[in-house]
UniProtKB/Swiss-Prot annotation:
Key words, A-Z: Autophagy, Cytoplasm, Hydrolase, Nucleus, Protease, Protein transport, Thiol protease, Transport
Name the record gives this protein: Probable cysteine protease ATG4
Domain of life: Eukaryota
Reactions catalysed according to its record: [protein]-C-terminal L-amino acid-glycyl-phosphatidylethanolamide + H2O = [protein]-C-terminal L-amino acid-glycine + a 1,2-diacyl-sn-glycero-3-phosphoethanolamine
Active site positions: C141, D315, H317
Compartment(s): Cytoplasm; Nucleus; Preautophagosomal structure
Lineage: Eukaryota, Fungi, Dikarya, Ascomycota, Saccharomycotina
Broad class of where this protein is predominantly found: cytoplasm
Gene (UniProt): ATG4
Amino acid sequence: METIHNISNRLQEVLATNKSVNVDTDNDSLSSNQEDNEVEKVRHLVVILGEKYSYAVDRNTGINALMQWFTTNSEIPEEILNAIRSKLNFTYRTNFEPIERAPDGPSPINPLIMLRINPIDAIENVFNNRECFFTDVGWGCMIRTGQSLLGNALQRVKSTVKDQPYIYEMDDTKEITDLFKDNTKSAFSLQNFVKCGRIYNKIAPGEWFGPATTATCIRYLIQENPCYGIEACYISVSSGDIFKENIQGMIDRYPNGNILILLGIKLGLDSVHERYWGEIKTMLESPFSVGIAGGRPSSSLYFFGYFDDTLLFFDPHNSQTALIDDFDESCHTENFGKLNFSDLDPSMLLGFLLPCSKWDEFQEFTSLLTIVNVLDGMDQYRDPDLNSNDIGNVELSPQLKLSQTPDAITDDDYVDIGALIQGNSMNINDRDNGYQEVQCKNQQIVIMDSLNETKPLEIEKVLVGQGTNLVNATTPCREAFPK
């Protein structure tokens, strides 16, 4: 009779060849039943931005085989691989159109950054212009994941307008990716994100963007440039609260349009509580989802789907050169990363694309969630310590342009609003760089008119008992994709 040790060895040999087996200890033998009996299959769900794919594997060897290809990205079913390849992925770039250093900002000559790029490029940049940034390596990851979220939202609009599935040939995405090329002429370029961040949030070139700043820049850039099918943008960085009156106002204005909804949330202190895992899956399964940006401390990723308890993401930290002819092709990849829900950072930016005609469906979808809430009004959620006389008209002026410099009193992603509560002036010299150190907070943004001007005043992240909430603004834009 074979020993248990021998049987174990033979089992491992058979499993290595991915065969289904029976152990027959009575007859002292191991026999394959692959030809004689139907092998029992187990189906696993793979979700990619609202699209669901079922993958069948043998019960006995399936987990090993499935985890192997999710570990090595090898032997992935072609249908799933095509779905991943079709999504847009924006990464660090080098040798792009120079961005001038701010007098009060960091220096482009950073040894840590220089070590992470091509040595020839580093030397060339030093000799050509020491006062300009030629790469966003080390500081641009949140901008890049914001671009990925926005780019895939635009791709969703295009596929819907043309009545096509979400997955199509990469040639169809060129008119979208051209909007993200690294030059000032491209509507959603890194250069324009940096310009917007400098004007409205006092973020200098070379400084890291937070989720709130990224969301704010996306909204302003949608306003400033032709929207290519996205007519309005609603953002909140205080919570996942969406107010009906704001959305309904946008729908009344653009009944056949699309609204990009960006929600900054924090689902825990150091990690995402397990009770939220299912809701994150539900959101990614929704046809409204355009992904999640963030999810790692000071190292943003773009999450586009999941498998079991593993999130799938694109990593923006893989740098590419900006001066290439096949730019569109470089925005697609088969390489993706995996992250367990237990390792996910709780601060993240959720993205949803809402066709105005599907507002009722979206509300029904959010009724399944506790993370995202559609609420009737916002008066009861205003901080009682904030006198209503201090808050002007919360409707943003549609004439606002990037060329203007409003009295934005934000710095980085957090500011102290104590001075605003007690008077009409604030000291913006005291910088709050404690984004990662804050363990308990109610992240906050308020956009309003100043007391004497029509320019917007933006305040982010306050530690309050009950948060005031974001208000939204939109301007008309032409339809870019013909029906």
